[in-house]
């Protein structure tokens, strides 16, 4: 871990997206095993979360872009 990191459990960076009744949180975090993104969907207090290791960021983003491009052509 690095000296200038926020306290444990605090995200290194965070984004919040609100769409209708849903709120999405994207938190970049770090622990002893490395950096990861915690993606949380909150719908009326019910939360679902996935953890994405930083080694998968680029592949995830590329797959996401392909889906967005495909959907735009429908």
Residue ranges and their predicted role:
Residues 1-74:
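Positively charged, low-complexity terminal tracts
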């Amino acid at each position: 871990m690095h000296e200038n990191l926020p306290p444990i459990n605090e995200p290194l960076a965070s984004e919040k997206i609100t769409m209708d009744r849903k709120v999405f949180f994207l938190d970049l975090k770090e622990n002893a095993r490395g950096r990861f993104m915690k993606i949380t969907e909150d719908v009326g207090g019910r939360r679902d979360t996935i953890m994405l290791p930083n080694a998968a960021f680029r592949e995830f983003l590329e797959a996401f872009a392909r889906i967005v491009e495909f959907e735009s052509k429908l």
